[in-house]
Amino acid sequence: MTVKSIKRAYQVIRTTLHYGLDDLIPSKVTPWYFKLLRGSLFWLRNKHKDKVGGERLKLAMQELGPVYIKFGQMLSTRRDLLSDEWAEELAMLQDRVPPFDSAIARESIEQELNAPIETYFDDFEDTPLASASISQVHTATLKSNGAKVVLKVLRPDVEQKVHADIQLMSQAANFLESLLGANNRLRPAEVVEDYRTTIEGELNLKLEALNAIKLRNNFLDSNALYIPYMYEELCFTRLIVMERIDGVPVSDKAALEAQGTNLKLLAERGVELFFTQVFRDNFFHADMHPGNIFVSREHPNDPFYIGLDCGIMGTLTDEDKRYLAENFLAFFNRDYRRIAQLYIESGWVSADTDISAFEQAVKVVCEPMFNKPLDEISFGHVLLELFRTARRFDMVVQPQLVLLEKTLLYIEGLGRQLYPQLDLWQTAKPFLEDWMAEQVGPKAMAGKIKQQLPYWADQLPELPELIYDNLKMGRNLAKTHNKLLDRYLKHQQKAHKSNYLLITSAILVICGTILLNQDATLWASYGSIGTGLILWVLGWRSRPKNRKF
């Protein structure tokens, strides 16, 4: 370890102890050496005993800086792991940091462009438009066509800082997991590994640009979502250049009402957008918090969303999509047995799970939800409660489903903030039913056959030869089978003969011994014993050798 990493490790330990986070570890799993070490750091006392655990964790992460703040934000979406109180505390974390020097920003941009800024841009604004833990945004005008653009550049040395903090997190998570045991519900090492994957993706701005281009192409003809244009030739690992947009923040409901936005239509389009991204395109924006979503200023009666920051995207397998759609339909049909079957069939929980116990657990959680009107039932809450229940049955964490759940909760919260009477089920049900019909109906079968036709057309000329080879192999197998069967029958015949001789010899020897003890005729007794011994020798010698068939 370097001196810098040792200092950072001490800073993390000091902050952890100052906020009493060690008190959150159950004492029954705390080993003696941990207690001894804690006692030796007597000057690092809990200075926030008056605060509850969730608030102390939030404040500690706020103090530890951007990487921990983003980790806390991610944890706030893992309501399958945390209580609602803790999740709400962590959701208050704000990813706001002071901007770094504009001279450093210029230097970083020019290093990526391999040219002075003035070669490509006019009116570069040194004062950043926005600043966050990973990157900073500046505005400019594109010299080639006069288009207004924004430049997003990574903070200096952010990669090294992130990797160092993630390494410390991973070590702490492994230690915590060793205390809690392999069967603990929290699985800290798994959570940190998920976070590592997410944040390392955000450190590659080129990947964000490619994600944005793909999402934009998926909605080119849409009246519901607009993704700003990416100038791909000016996009690199540490810098991206995109079209500058003008919109109303989706969280500013007063401004939306002031411009006469159709909030009911906007809320319904948000739900449709989610299901379209997930089920039609299998490529969904997984970071749709209000800071990344704007609403168009033009055509307020026919509003559309503007999506930013495509650094975190999600995809599902075809099986995941089908199981997910069936889960929702089974829930609203109150078919809890089917929900339990789906979790087992999908492999999300083990095949040896007690399906009746799982069904009952699902029913206990889901049935009370139907005490409220359908338009008040939250899809995200349903998914969350199902995941929480499945975790009790050792559900294997599915990172793609965690992203989906987080996105769904964002979309629902957003939709009901815009239009509290939003009926998610009525909006989503036709979409889900149509999608299921397309996947499992005659149309789906015809589509799969059509998709496979080129392959079978290519294989058709070889089909007669393959049939002949298989028939020949079948004949050979039949011959081999007959030979083995014949050998087996002969082996069994020998075994029966040997067993018969051995049993007969034993009977004769026993009878001869009895006659001898009863003073019977000597020749009869000795003759019986002698014959028995001869038969025993013959039986022993005729035993078949052990064979493997």
UniProtKB/Swiss-Prot annotation:
CDD domains: UbiB
Gene Ontology MF, one: ATP binding
HAMAP family referenced in this protein's UniProt entry, alphabetically: UbiB
Domain of life: Bacteria
Function of the protein: Is probably a protein kinase regulator of UbiI activity which is involved in aerobic coenzyme Q (ubiquinone) biosynthesis.
Family the entry assigns: Belongs to the ABC1 family. UbiB subfamily.
Keywords: ATP-binding, Cell inner membrane, Cell membrane, Kinase, Membrane, Nucleotide-binding, Transferase, Transmembrane, Transmembrane helix, Ubiquinone biosynthesis
Catalytic center residues: 287
Signal peptide start and end residues: none
Annotated metabolic or biological route of this protein: Cofactor biosynthesis; ubiquinone biosynthesis [regulation]
Cellular component GO terms held in the UniProt record: plasma membrane
Keyword Oxidoreductase recorded: no
GO biological process, one term: ubiquinone biosynthetic process
Enzyme Commission designation: 2.7.-.-
Boundaries of every Protein kinase domain copy: 123-501
EC class: transferase
One Pfam family hit: ABC1
Binding positions (ATP): 129-137, 152
Membrane-topology annotation of the record: Multi-pass membrane protein
The organism of origin for this protein: Shewanella piezotolerans (strain WP3 / JCM 13877)
Chain's gene name: ubiB
Protein name, as recorded: Probable protein kinase UbiB
InterPro entries named in the record: ABC1_dom, Kinase-like_dom_sf, UbiB, UbiB_bact, UbiB_kinase
Segments passing through the bilayer: 498-518, 520-540
Entry's localization field: Cell inner membrane
